[in-house]
Amino acid sequence: MTFKSLTPVALALVLSACQSTGMSDSKAEQINHVSQPVYVLEYQSAARFKAESDNLALAFSRYCEQADLDTDKLKTQWHQTMTAWMALQGQERGPAAALEQSWNVQFWPDKKNTTGRKMASLVHQDREWTAEQIAQQSVTVQGLGALEWMLYDPKSPLTSAPKSACQSALGISQNLADKAALIESAWQQNPWKTMDDATWESEYVALLSNQLEHAMSKMTRPLANVGQPRPYFSESWRSKTSMLNLKANVEAMQALYLASLDGQLRERNLVELADRVKTQYANLVDTWPAEPSLFDMLQTKEGYRDALSQYNKLDQLKYLLHEEVAVALGVVLGFNSSDGD
């Protein structure tokens, strides 16, 4: 693997990702292409998500074997898996085989609590579910949201009737691990290697833009109208970790920017613009609220204001990418399919 084009910060993030997956031999494609620094980060994110998903399936297996009713380890591993997913969430650029797994990994937004209704029905069926059978069911019972319901919803039988819950929990967690393996496998090839420099540049800015807009949607839906928030539209409202998820989104986007775009802007003597974008990312991370739950923040006027303040910073970052970076590079950003409902 060649790290020549990586900035020091991005290099540290890549090395950290390598260590977190526990892999000594990277399966990332090794080529000499302008997209390579970004591709390396994307592959490592996919590899980390696979490793965490495998760990989550193993944690459920051990829990169901021991039935010790201690869900703390399960919850910790679920959160680590969710955090790993944040680096890939909201993507619309990359291998089609990876992108098509997004809804299977996470069903959100869930405007009508479909996950709650479907999971309540699933766990009350007296049968064992294999990963293959779960994969044929609704996406609402397949991924991270289904396992969050299992771990945090008061209607879940995981602690009150673990034997019953494990009939579906094992299949769901293994199905998630299977989907993560498909995603990691798809990222073993650089999807951008045939692009010329101009095409890649447009793709790169769009990649950042798509993920940013998805992150912003995770705030606009629950923020709704001033004075009329919709806290149940928050991602991970059951586990109350939505703000932690969003911070992980921002940190992943920051790493993608630093991997190459920051250097490209500086090479074109757009140093002042590069500094402003870099500072905006850093400011977002440094001022992120300590409160882990957007659901809880929206219960008070002060919390709502704090959440809105962070959203405005994301909006400023969007302006920098769309109106300044894209214009400076001659990139035209098209319609984002995640916009609207």
Indicate where each model-derived feature is located.
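Bacterial signal peptide processing site
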Residues: 19-22
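Bacterial N-terminal signal peptides that target proteins for export
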Residues: 1-7
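C-terminal motif of bacterial Sec signal peptides marking the signal peptidase cleavage site
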Residues: 14-17
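Mature extracytoplasmic or organellar-lumen-exposed domains after removal of signal/transit peptides
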Residues: 24-341
